[in-house]
């Protein structure tokens, strides 16, 4: 470029270019989550540069394989930033793919970043990787890799995804029923131990860290201790467990006290990505390697790219800011619901100890119908459960109240919370 414009102008232009290159060079060198988030155009340029390393971008290549990243539409290619070969090999999900050097770098870098991200949030782990499948599929992958017996011990939670995951992995299920303590639905560690003793061939314990109230988190430290004592793998469903310190602290106590093989969280619920990705993390890297070997075939790069985009866009500061806002919105939600309770005889805020969601008993109202009417009023997310519903209540013998749950998860806005409670009151009034 020298000689085309004056040198001082050229140097000025290089300064601008360097400002874009510098974060990329630092990322490739340090391989850590950036403190500050990146602009979208820098992220996009970085991803396209990586994807141009894949063999399907070689203009002189003779592509004669049955899988050559051919796409019918440019739109499809753009939707994955050119990573059309996907990630992984048929043997191991996290292994480099010879036809996709760029995608392999992208995947390895994403896993480095998500590990660093979790450690800096305070999780006691040795490694993590992104799975191109949401929470249920990721749980099934972990169970298929680690389970050696015939049935999974499952402290009961009203969620079809983990139940289907157990079946998909080829195991039977021994359900541990829950108990009521005040307003909370809890798991007795003694019942888990009894299930382990009665099972002739326990494959694993699938515990629950995060769930809708009034279902409480499982007693993870006690379950971890039992899994270590009985020599049974322990898989933790922490679907949205990354976004709050209460879940982190409970998980860390379990890791310190006993056996936790792997933890599964969702990328969309924690990293604000499109649905489709999971994060598997563990206190032992070899266990993660074993899980990655269980994945059948190559995988889509889209959920991995989505996770990387979110990590780079937010940075550590951006994510911590979202965590602070979530706490503020949850406090606002509780305040508004308590105010509603003080003004109405048909509403009681349940004591559930959940940092993400609140539960409200609604006397004289059908909670399922109430949640449906809120949906029509353009309030998405409330969950209505009847007291005699053995599935919805997460208790085979039912619950003492009809209730609805309202979430204030990461990414929620104050105006969302205010509008939801206002419309709830209108529906209670029958307006």
From Swiss-Prot:
Top-level taxon in the UniProt lineage: Archaea
Keyword Repeat listed? The answer is no
Cofactor(s) demanded? pyridoxal 5'-phosphate
Ligand binding (substrate): 89-90, 97, 298
Q: Which GO terms describe its biological process?
A: conversion of seryl-tRNAsec to selenocys-tRNAsec; selenocysteine incorporation
Q: Where is this region: Tetramerization?
A: 1-36
Note down the stretches annotated as region Phosphate loop (P-loop): 88-98
Function, as annotated, reads:
Converts O-phosphoseryl-tRNA(Sec) to selenocysteinyl-tRNA(Sec) required for selenoprotein biosynthesis.
Q: State what protein this is by name.
A: O-phosphoseryl-tRNA(Sec) selenium transferase
Gene transcribed to yield this protein: spcS
